[in-house]
Amino acid sequence: MAKGMMASTEARTQTQQRPVTRELASFASKLRYEEVQPEVRKRVLLLTLDQIGAALVASTLDYITRVREYALEESPDGLSTVIGSQRKLRPEWAALSNATAGHGVETDDYHNIALAHPGCVPVPSVLAVAEQIDARGHETIVALALGFETIIRFGLCVMPSMIKDRGFHETCVMGVFGSAVGAGRLLGLDPETLASALGLAASHASGTTEYAESGGEVKRLHAGLAAMGGLRSLSLARRGFRGPPTILEGRRGVFQAFSDEYRVDAMVEDLGNRWDFLTTAIKPYCCCGLIHAHIDALRALMAEEGLRPDDVLEIIVGTDPLSLVHVNRIGARPADMNSAQFSSHFSLAMTLVMGGNDFAHYVAAQSAGFSDPAVVRIAEKIRLELDPEAEAAFPEHFLARVRVKRRDGSTIERTRYATGTPDAPLTEAEIRGKYRRMAGGIVGDATANAIERAIDALADDAPARDVLRPLSAGARRS
């Protein structure tokens, strides 16, 4: 799909007037639970579980705490749960805090072709509204499916140009529309009002990827800003405040504003019959998804060739063009957690020296000031280069070739697809195991299990409020 995704200027001109904003709004407003295929419903629940686990594991971090404290200070009391607090806030403020946490440690989901994170904005947005209006499970599943799909479809329209050519961050640019569509469906907005809300949401679309060049914590906040922006846009639209109903496809709409190359029709092609978010990847490692294939190839060399740090003269990572831009800049000496997670050099060195790339490994690296001599020594021996096979496969497939020159004069290499993607998917048991490790380590097994049961119960039309209710019960780590 992606090879034909990018349109010429002539083709864009011919298709840009298709009213995809209104088509999307109409579809979202009218979709019924019975029309959502069983495999779609099941995937919604697993992605929701994974996202809540990601938010819980990040909830104790300093920078997440600062955002939560800001929300608690600014918001009046409400009905929406704030992860990490016993207070409940207005939906937009709870979503700001929870979405920032959900995107807070690079363990949330991602999509190869759309190059997007579909879960971290719709899940907190939809659940915050669901708590406020006491929504049931089936309508919540529909809303989440629409939020996920909106983000992925947006990515299919504008990626990879939006990030590679313009440097915009997909989570905030696309996420605000996923928030608006998902929560707007839950609120029962008619097509005209929802289209207007999308027009307003565009004014919240923002965020660059400069964090991948020089670090900073702002990337985490992009999910929160998108969630809040989507909900605020809905509130204004419901009061009659209008936005342009051609905001996606228009001559001065968001597609042309954020991308050099885009395809308007991808937003609505076969909508309802084909759900592109089904191929969303769930991360096994706590770092940028572009690095995962690099890690998998290196892990194969460790397991199959007995590779050790002392063996290494040089590590050459053959990869795709976007990785050369997005995870190749920071190098061997990251300044903070975010930059470590966007450094292929440092993350691969952690794999070889520390034995893994879980959240706990990055916390340990942070405790050492990201300057552990053994890790830095290996990181300085790593370089990235363009690999023809990886380039040809990208973005449908995340592929990497890792070649290691050893001190004994030999060279070994492995090629791997990224674990967690459709090429090497995690099983349902592995996804649930990941959630239980993340959530159980923060709130205890009893609370984590109660949340998991409540998410599964959405399929039986249980109240959506039950999903985060265990956190409000004051359960402590067990």
Model-identified regions with their sequence ranges:
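Terminal-appendage/accessory-domain detector
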Residues: 1-115, 218-228, 235-478
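Well-ordered alpha-helical scaffold segments within catalytic/enzyme domains
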Residues: 58, 126-133, 180-186, 233-237, ...
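Secretory-pathway/luminal and periplasmic proteins that interact with or process carbohydrate-rich
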Residues: 76-79, 150-159, 204-212, 324
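Short, charged, amphipathic alpha-helices and their helix-cap/turn boundaries
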Residues: 87-106, 142-156, 193-204, 256-257
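Hydrophobic alpha-helical hairpins/lids featuring a short glycine-rich hinge
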Residues: 101-158
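Active-site nucleophile and cofactor-binding loops and adjacent substrate-binding regions
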Residues: 114-120, 140-144, 162-176, 219-225, ...
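Amphipathic alpha-helical interface segments
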Residues: 121-124, 166-186, 196-266
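Structural helix-adjacent loops and short alpha-helical linkers that scaffold large soluble proteins
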Residues: 132-144, 188-195, 243-246
